[in-house]
């Protein structure tokens, strides 16, 4: 069995803030490709949602990563993510990243009332026991942290450039 994660590079303000927190890492967003083809993730606009696969036309590059797991882990990952749909975006976490001020991890992160994209995916991977430990505090995990955690489980491929966008801007 596999779960598929989509890492995305964009040029908007939020992407630039996250890129700074990630020390220039190429991807500023991560979401899960669900079995029905939707992309489930957390965005500033709309919080946690399952969006149509073609919703994102302004990306610069994306990278799909297939992560091996058992059928039970795949089901637990999907169940956890779907239970988060409707929760708002964690704007405070992004502000803390931008300011370099971290208030710490809430001990009840599985029940978080809001999510950033990478914290959502990290929590799903942990809940499903696909990864055994968070690569950073769950609440402030970045897409880079998620990719590093997954790189121990699978071969990471090449990104696909969006032909409609020419470059990644800082």
Give the role of each language-model region.
Residues 40, 89-90, 133-134:
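Secondary-structure boundary/capping residues
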Residues 4-71, 103-111:
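Glycine-rich catalytic cores of cysteine/serine-nucleophile enzymes that process amide/ester linkages
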Residues 97-170:
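Activation targets extended, charge/polar-rich intrinsically disordered C-terminal tails
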Residues 27, 77, 117-120:
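Generic hydrophobic secondary-structure packing signal
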Residues 2-27, 143-148, 157-169:
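Donor-binding and catalytic core of enzymes assembling or modifying cell-surface/extracellular glycoconjugates
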Residues 71-100:
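A structural motif
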């Amino acid at each position: 069995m596999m779960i598929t994660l989509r890492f995305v590079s964009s040029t908007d303000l939020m992407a630039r803030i996250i890129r700074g927190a990630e020390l220039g890492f190429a991807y500023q967003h991560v979401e899960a490709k669900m079995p029905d083809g939707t992309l489930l993730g957390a965005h500033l606009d709309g919080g946690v949602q399952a969006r149509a696969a073609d919703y994102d036309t302004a990306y610069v590059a994306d990278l799909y990563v297939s992560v091996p797991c058992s059928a039970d882990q795949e089901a637990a990952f999907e169940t956890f993510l779907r239970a988060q749909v409707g929760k708002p975006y964690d704007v405070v976490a992004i502000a803390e990243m931008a300011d370099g001020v971290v208030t710490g991890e809430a001990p009840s992160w599985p029940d978080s009332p809001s999510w950033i994209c990478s914290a959502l995916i990290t929590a799903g991977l942990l809940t499903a026991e696909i990864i055994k430990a968070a690569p950073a505090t769950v609440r402030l995990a970045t897409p880079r942290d998620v990719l590093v955690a997954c790189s121990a489980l699978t071969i990471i491929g090449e990104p696909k450039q969006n032909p409609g966008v020419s470059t990644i801007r800082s």
